[in-house]
Structures are given as C-alpha cells and as structure tokens.
Amino acid sequence: MGKWVMIAVAWLAVAGGAVAQTAQSLGAPAGSAERGKKVYMEQLCYTCHGTVGQGGDRGSGPKIYPNPFPYAAFATQVRKPRQVMPPYSDKHVSDQDLADMYHYLFSTKPSPVAKDIPLLKNF
C-alpha cells in the first residue's frame, strides 16, 4: 500500500472514532505544548493556519484543528507539503519542534461560537 493511502486510512480511522485521544495515541513522540506554541508562532504558522490551527482568516491555510490527524501525516505535510505551503526541513524545524507543535495543536480548544457568548447574543 502506498504511503499516502496508509496515511489516509489512518486519518479516517482517527476521524471516525471519537475515543479519548492523546497526541501519543496518534503517533507523536513526547513533546511540550508550551514549547510548541512558541515554535508555531516563531515559524509564522499562524499567519495561514490561525493562532490555534482554526484556519486562516483569508482562507489561505487549511484548518488543522479540531480534527487531529496522525502525527506521521502532520510531519509529512510540514516536511514535504503538497500545497502552496513552503517545506520546512529539519534545518528550520527540528524533529522535536515538530513534536512540540503537534502537542500544541492537539492541546488547543475550539473557540466558542458567537451565540454562546452572552455579550454577543443580542447582536
């Protein structure tokens, strides 16, 4: 089976089952969400993907949260992207940086919708 087919199958398995997941259960090495946030901001990932992976305001970067995909797919996309995203070699983003960013994205919480914010209910 090709690498992309295996990644797609793994992603569908993860997306289909709403089991309590951890970053490690999706194949990520140990990492620090705090350090991952720093790397994510320093590498300017937020300019396309939003501050917590919710997608870019201009639609330039796809949403990468709240549906986490396997770590292998994340790492492959960062290293050898298939879209307009620039590649990040291990000279720019270390393997540990990748793990840390994954832990950061996995730890983020979705923003509330406007109707659930009391001050915005009347607008």
Which role does the model predict for each range below?
Residues M1-W4:
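Positively charged n-region of N-terminal signal peptides that target proteins for export
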Residues M6-A15:
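Bacterial N-terminal signal peptides
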Residues V19-M41, G55:
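Electrostatic cytochrome c docking/interface patches
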Residues L26, Q54-R58, P68, K115-F123:
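Mature soluble domains of exported/periplasmic/lumenal proteins and thiol-rich metal-chelating peptides
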Residues A33-K37, G50-P87:
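Gly/Gly-Pro-rich "capping" loops immediately C-terminal to redox-active cysteine motifs
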Residues G36, E42-T51, M85, M101, ...:
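The canonical Cys-X-X-Cys-His
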Residues D90-F123:
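C-terminal capping alpha-helices of c-type cytochrome domains
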